[in-house]
Amino acid sequence: MSEKKNIYPNKEGCPVEFTLDVIGGKWKGILFYHMIDGKKRFNEFRRICPSITQRMLTLQLRELEADGIVHREVYHQVPPKVEYSLTEFGRTLEPIVLQMKEWGESNRDVLESYRSNGLVKDQQK
């Protein structure tokens, strides 16, 4: 199992940084969001996120599992079946992720406007 670069970031410091370490990054929040609706299998995540590599998906799920956010259920059958679901502890992050979703839906156009017409372009002139 891989180790995180920063297992316990700023342990005595910023709780926001600590939370972002758990659900931050390109894929963890997306994987988490899709597990809110229920269990997912590995290949379901591959269909949901076609640009994620198998290696990265495995690493992200392992990190979420190591943090106690995700439960990995292995069914001993042929072909092998593995399902991922949120733990009770993981569900405590659900309101945060749903609020992030709501913010994204409400502010996508504003952010895109800033990105296309905003400060970055003004500084390049």
UniProtKB/Swiss-Prot annotation:
Disulfide-bond pairs as recorded: none
A Pfam family: HxlR
Gene3D superfamilies linked to this entry: Winged helix-like DNA-binding domain superfamily/Winged helix DNA-binding domain
Keywords: DNA-binding, Transcription, Transcription regulation
InterPro entries: HTH_HxlR, WH-like_DNA-bd_sf, WH_DNA-bd_sf
SUPFAM superfamilies on file: Winged helix' DNA-binding domain
Signal sequence extent: none
GO-annotated molecular function: DNA binding
Protein name: Uncharacterized HTH-type transcriptional regulator YybR
Biological source species: Bacillus subtilis (strain 168)
